[in-house]
């Protein structure tokens, strides 16, 4: 079988590597791919958001399945366009991907269906938003409504920081159209947990829990990023909490989307906060998280191609998905300066010296036979082991073997206590 994967980051590398393990899959294309993905798939020079280009390629090359991984093409309706052309596609349609594409839609959905989340208000003008901030006080959370590469959230510890975030988003255009509307939320406390689930429109099967590290620097300091590392499972996500989330959050969300005429098919990511008052939803993503996917898929013990087909055919209930007991840790190596300005084209050395981890490539490309940096998040060094502590040690031992100019990584992935 032939599969086309859309995207070019560490998440897509993990998806391609996992699909390549399937005895049913004998050909993988990835558009646009990257320097690491090129080792397991044929990279195609088509942008992930080029719907017409992807559809034309699929019509010409006839993949048995197209897997749309990133948020932007999902929000633009790539799955709808592929299905309209008679091509099997994995991922939510445009009207379901809105659960990530608009935070105000997601908040209103949760409010309507009684799904636990933080209190909130939505604003399109800064004057009203600032008045609300002054009324509520700090700490408070300001979120751009639309897609902002994971960087549209400000956890403001002072009113001044919150007001600055509102002005940047609405008046300053910091996130373009994505920030023209903002959601202002109550500040929640507790451990954060990511739970991804396969969803076929009616049923869902959750993956093992994970925990992301969004801040750029150690001790959760610095600006938000797309994610500096992840580990699985979460230390805090017990069987009791999992059962509670299934009844109060996971099933109600899938049912709510179906009731709204927006059945969700694909991977639904639940960003949760385990508060003193119980689990609450911080955010939804309409796709595999990055870098959680690198950690979680390293633990998969079933055929990913079969799972994708079960989702598309709405037969998720008929398959059994197995996971390894091992823990996993993914440490992201980023370009110096990320998530702000950074340089590209730095030669990466030491990849052949890695012994105990798998290195997922994110912002890399091939240049004159060498792997060079081409993005903010460059590599995801991922190790599995019987215990989380062992996985962390293995991952960091290999991180220290890899070098590129101004490389930056957090030293506390997996050590986080809350």
Where are these regions (language model features)?
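Short, charged, surface-exposed secondary-structure boundary motifs
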Residues: 38-41, 55, 98-104, 217-218
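Internal nucleotide-binding/catalytic subdomain
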Residues: 156-293
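Active-site "cap" helix and flanking loop/linker of ATP-utilizing ligase/carboxylase catalytic domains
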Residues: 246-268, 285-354
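Active-site nucleotide/adenylate-binding loops and adjacent lid/helix of ATP-dependent enzymes
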Residues: 4-5, 100-181, 211, 235, ...
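ATP-binding N-terminal substructure of ATP-dependent carboxylate-amine bond-forming enzymes
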Residues: 1-94
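Peripheral (often C-terminal) accessory segments that flank ATP-dependent C-N-forming ligase machineries
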Residues: 310-418
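Solvent-exposed alpha-helices and their adjacent loops that cap or buttress functional pockets
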Residues: 20-21, 36-38, 60, 90, ...
């Amino acid at each position: 079988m032939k599969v086309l994967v859309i995207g070019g980051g560490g998440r897509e590398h993990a998806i391609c590597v996992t699909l390549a393990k399937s005895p049913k899959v004998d050909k993988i294309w990835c558009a646009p791919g990257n320097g690491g993905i090129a080792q397991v798939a044929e990279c195609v020079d088509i942008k992930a958001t080029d719907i017409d280009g992807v559809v034309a390629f699929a019509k010409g090359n006839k993949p048995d399945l197209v897997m749309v991984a990133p948020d932007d093409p999902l929000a633009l309706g790539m799955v709808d366009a592929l299905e309209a052309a008679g091509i099997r596609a994995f991922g939510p349609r445009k009207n379901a991907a809105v659960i990530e594409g608009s935070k105000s839609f997601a908040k209103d959905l949760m409010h309507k269906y009684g799904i636990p989340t933080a209190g909130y208000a939505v604003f399109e003008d800064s004057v009203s938003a600032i008045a609300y901030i002054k009324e509520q006080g700090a700490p408070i959370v300001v979120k751009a409504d639309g897609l902002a590469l994971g960087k549209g959230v400000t956890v403001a510890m002072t009113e001044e920081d919150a007001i600055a975030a509102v002005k940047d988003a609405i008046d300053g255009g910091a996130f373009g159209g994505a920030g023209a509307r903002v959601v202002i939320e109550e500040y929640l406390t507790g451990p954060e947990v990511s739970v991804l689930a396969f969803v076929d429109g009616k049923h869902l099967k959750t993956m093992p829990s994970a925990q992301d590290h969004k801040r750029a620097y150690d001790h959760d300091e610095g600006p938000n990023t797309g994610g500096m590392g992840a580990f699985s499972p979460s230390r805090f996500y017990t069987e009791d909490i999992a059962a509670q989330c299934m009844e109060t959050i996971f099933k109600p969300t899938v049912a709510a989307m179906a009731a709204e005429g927006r059945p969700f098919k694909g991977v639904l990511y639940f960003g949760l906060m385990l508060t003193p008052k119980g689990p609450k939803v911080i955010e939804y993503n309409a796709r595999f998280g990055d870098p959680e996917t690198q950690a979680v898929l390293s633990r998969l013990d079933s055929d990913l191609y079969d799972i994708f087909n079960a989702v598309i055919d709405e037969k998720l209930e008929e398959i059994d998905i197995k996971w390894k007991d091992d823990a996993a840790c993914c440490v992201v190596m980023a370009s110096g300066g990320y998530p702000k300005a950074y340089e590209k084209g730095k030669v990466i050395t030491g990849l052949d010296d890695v012994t105990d981890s798998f290195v997922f490539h994110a912002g890399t490309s091939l240049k004159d036979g060498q792997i060079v940096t081409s993005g903010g998040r460059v590599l995801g060094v991922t190790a599995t082991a019987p215990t989380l502590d062992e996985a962390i040690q293995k991952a960091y031992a290999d991180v220290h073997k890899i070098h590129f100019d101004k490389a930056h990584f957090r030293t506390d992935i997996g050590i986080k206590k809350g």
